[in-house]
């Protein structure tokens, strides 16, 4: 490719400093063919359909890049279950698979460069206890700790055993837990007896 294209990529990197969509790349004068070639050459990292990370020695991806990238693909998706417990600080080990929640009616494709476990929620359950994390790369949604612990029990078969045990152990010691809120959510999700058997109030 001609040097003028590489100069343009450097200009784009300086301007956007990270994530950029196909639409903006084309607004900056790149063609689909050039975008494909730049991706093959390692100048662009395709994080999902229509979304890229500009590779530059001057900056690197944020630690929470998985959450940021999911939100760029589907801004209404919510980090849930074990992953939410990590982002909310209950556990310090990041699950390898990112757990995300979407509405049952959500038809967004969530094909990412990393593995995700997608869970579908009813309208009412989807809206409960959402927190918004604002970053310079955009915002993303995360469920609160009490409901996320409950979701871990609900989706136990989809969660790494060691991560699940860490969530339960840490929640038992968590001094800000709201058992009333957790049990209300558990009963609404029809897993009240499962939660009681585990004994989160020890």
Model-identified regions with their sequence ranges:
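Basic, Lys/Arg-rich alpha-helical nucleic-acid-recognition elements, primarily the DNA-binding modules
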Residues: 7-16, 44
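Polyanion-binding surface elements
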Residues: 13-30
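Glycine-rich phosphate/ribose-binding loops and adjacent secondary-structure elements
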Residues: 28, 51-53
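Nucleic-acid-binding surface
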Residues: 4-8, 19-24, 39, 54-202
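FIC/Doc superfamily catalytic core
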Residues: 1-6, 33
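Short amphipathic alpha-helical interaction segments
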Residues: 28-40
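A short, conserved structural fragment
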Residues: 42-49
